[in-house]
Curated annotation (Swiss-Prot):
Protein task: Catalyzes the methylthiolation of N6-(dimethylallyl)adenosine (i(6)A), leading to the formation of 2-methylthio-N6-(dimethylallyl)adenosine (ms(2)i(6)A) at position 37 in tRNAs that read codons beginning with uridine.
Name of the protein this chain belongs to: tRNA-2-methylthio-N(6)-dimethylallyladenosine synthase
Catalytic activity field: N(6)-dimethylallyladenosine(37) in tRNA + (sulfur carrier)-SH + AH2 + 2 S-adenosyl-L-methionine = 2-methylsulfanyl-N(6)-dimethylallyladenosine(37) in tRNA + (sulfur carrier)-H + 5'-deoxyadenosine + L-methionine + A + S-adenosyl-L-homocysteine + 2 H(+)
The protein's Enzyme Commission number: 2.8.4.3
GO cellular component: cytosol
Cofactor(s) needed by this chain: [4Fe-4S] cluster
A GO MF term: metal ion binding
Cofactor note: Binds 2 [4Fe-4S] clusters. One cluster is coordinated with 3 cysteines and an exchangeable S-adenosyl-L-methionine.
Subcellular location: Cytoplasm
Limits of the TRAM domain: 404-483
Amino acid sequence: MTQQAANALPPVARTYQVRTYGCQMNVHDSERLAGLLEDAGYRRAADGADADVVVFNTCAVRENADNKLYGNLSHLAPRKRSEPQMQIAVGGCLAQKDRDAVLRRAPWVDVVFGTHNIGSLPTLLERARHNRAAQVEIAEALQEFPSTLPAARESAYAGWVSISVGCNNTCTFCIVPSLRGKEVDRRPGDVLAEIQTLVDQGVLEVTLLGQNVNAYGVSFAADERLREDPRMWQSAPHRNRGAFAELLRACGRIDGLERVRFTSPHPAEFTDDVIEAMAETPNVCPALHMPLQSGSDRILRAMRRSYRAEKYLGIIDRVRAAIPDAAITTDLIVGFPGETEEDFQATLDVVAASRFSSAFTFQYSKRPGTPAADMPGQLPKAVVSERYQRLIELQERISLEENQAQVGRTLELLVATGEGRKDAATARLSGRARDGRLVHFAPGAAADEPLARRAFDQVRPGDVVTTTVTGAAPHHLIADGALLTHRRTRAGDAHAAGLRPRTGVGLGIPGVGAPAPAPVTTGCAL
């Protein structure tokens, strides 16, 4: 081929890969990063292939997050030396925290961006290629609400929907508020419009996201009055305390939306109107994830958690009275500074009384910049590890007993992908019950399906089935009998066709077009 003919060929789009660490907020942010890159002309790298651009979306909650990031960056260093045209970007909470330190520890990184300016990523990548220099851009405040950005959703059947970003709490162990900023809430109409967009594309389930979802309404309650007359600030309400319950009820009026979940509420602000909305809104799932952190009132006070064990247990009692089949899960921290054996026993007592279906349990991790990092009474690792094992053993026993109580029940499952590591070996598929429990099930033909359709009606991720639980383990259920029903869905059609929902409008986000392929040279490429 002549050089002139080669130059006439369209440029090949560069490929990208996003690696995500941390919470659901980061998972959803990674969908936005993917959407931004695809809108800019990049395409997702095939599984197992080396991407031209590797983006790390990081977490800063625990020390091992630091170790994981810098370990993975070190693994990419040899490739960067041999392929200088490839690019590495680091974003998220750890980038917001470490800033220029990322380049000091990993000088082969091309772009560092923070939690407030993820929309800048395509421009920063292009600028780094053009200028042959690393770009560090950390904004101190939110530049645009992330949900206005384009998002390439991972799932055809379930979607994350942010209702707020940031947090107004001051938990002494948590670094998130300093990295994500004060709480900013989306307008209910914007939230509901995004949900409707997802449902219109076949999505059956949404999870409402916020650092403290039941504080929803804190940042927009005063706005309407202030628009009319800024002098009314003193008399304007600073909070619509019923806003989150109202939002749940509004979700119940969206046709085609079958499941609504939310994470995470704060016990200090959990009100009965939310319990009533959960119980009275059919598509709100009977599931509640509510962080406890500690069962000791003394430790809760030191954590600045603004509730005590009695209040927490009272919420659980009221939830179970209104929603008897609710599955309740939690977060727990072991080894907070100053924790005594008596404090730890109080945590065991609350866990035993709460009967959580599962718990995310962590050993306390000292995070520089948090008040807890400078507290006296930092515990030896051996003490923390021993207590952690005792807590795990208790919760594993409770989880198994709670799951064993499900044996014989008929459950509706939303068929999922990537949930069962042994599905290929066991010939099972996996799905989530309405209460969030993971169920591995035999995908045989449903009893209600005509024989002529059974070969056609293969069960697909995004479809809905009902089945009977036949076995239990601490972290999952087994259903090895024949399916009772199988409903094909638009979400299943979309998954089978490889289609992913798209949301966001990209307001104010510059498009950079498909980047031209970089020539293979020494040094950084244009």
